[in-house]
């Protein structure tokens, strides 16, 4: 339901072309306050997502459905079209969305296959980056686009950048030329 406002991603779910299962790490919180974060061990600013609730959440995902585990992280490899195409070929993908200052390094070291960044800027949480990743990957799944060849000529496919100006054929005449 959360993806309803996401247009194409929601439509792809409704058509059963993709399946998105959300896991709430607060269900694996360590206390009655649903705490999933803690101050960094050794000091420092901000809060870090704790290892225990994250590990429990990962382990609660059916092993056969877990697949490749990606952590959306500003320290990760910058996402590009080649990576999108590679990830689109995977049967299952688990995306960990960080918050605060990040997640406990033990989770990264023992469970994460890959860290991915969508750019050199800060977001409130990894959910926004995950949505970008899901949308870009799902465009490459058969049946998601009206024209199956559309993604072959996308801006970044095969090193292409749009090399022409784009116009529509409507008769808008507002003195625009």
PLM region spans:
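Short, glycine/polar-rich helix-capping loops at beta-to-alpha or helix-loop-helix junctions
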Residues: 100-108
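Fold-independent oxyanion-binding glycine-rich loops
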Residues: 25, 72-75, 97-100, 119, ...
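Structured adenosyl-cofactor binding patch, chiefly the S-adenosyl-L-methionine
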Residues: 107-149, 154
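Long, charged alpha-helical interface segments
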Residues: 156-169
